[in-house]
Amino acid sequence: MPTTRCSGPFLVVAPLSLIAQWQSEIALWSPDINCVVMHGSQQARDIILSYEFYYHEAFTPKADVQALRKKNACKFDVLLTTYEICMKDIKLFTKIDWKVLIVDEAHRLKNHQARLFEVMKTIPRQQCVLLTGTPLQNKTEELWALLHFADPTKFKNQHEFVSQFGDLRDATDVAKLHSVLKPYLLRRVKEDVEKTLPPKEEVIVEVRNFIQFSHFAGHFYYCNIE
C-alpha cells in the first residue's frame, strides 16, 4: 500500500461528535486537501452533491469535465460523513470506487448481522482502516466481525475462527491469535504517542458518609439526564 502521494477519494465514516475533529485535523496537517463534510438535511446534502462531488463546466473546461466524468472522478479528496448519513445515502457511496475507507469507532461493526454492517460492507474500497479502542469487548465473534469486514476473503468463516480462538484457554492460544492479528493490527500505546507523560499514578480516596454521597450523586446524575 503506498504511503505518500496517494490520490483519493477517501471516505471517512465517524460518529457525528467526531466529524468536527476530523475536519480540524485534516485542515491542520494537510491544508491542501479538499475535504468535504456530507451531513445535514436532504436539501443540504443535495446541494453538496450538486456542487462539491463532481466537476462542472462552469468551473472547468468542457473537455476536461467530459474526461473526468468518464472516470467518475470526484472533486474532493476526502469525504467525511456519519454512520447515519452513510446508511441513508448508501446508493450514492456505492457508486464511487474509494481508495480507502476509514471507519472511526469501528466497534460499532462488531455485529455482523446488523444492518449497519451489511450496508457498509457494500461500499467499494481498495483499502480499509478500522479505528477502535476496543477490538475485543466481550466475545471473539466481535473480533471476527471486524476482521471479516477488513478482509472477507481470509476471514470468511466465523465458525472456524471461533472454534480455533473462541476459548483462548492458555498462552499458546493467545500467541496463535496474536500471530493472526499481527499483519492487520497497528496498536497505539501511550509510550509511542507522548513520551513526556508521567507514569500512571493511582490515588485511592476514602469516601465517608456514603449514604449522603449516594443521594447527591444520584441527584446529579438525573439532573444531567433531564
Annotate the PLM regions.
Residues M1-D170, H178-V203, R208-E226:
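ASCE P-loop NTPase motor core, strongest for the SF2 helicase catalytic module
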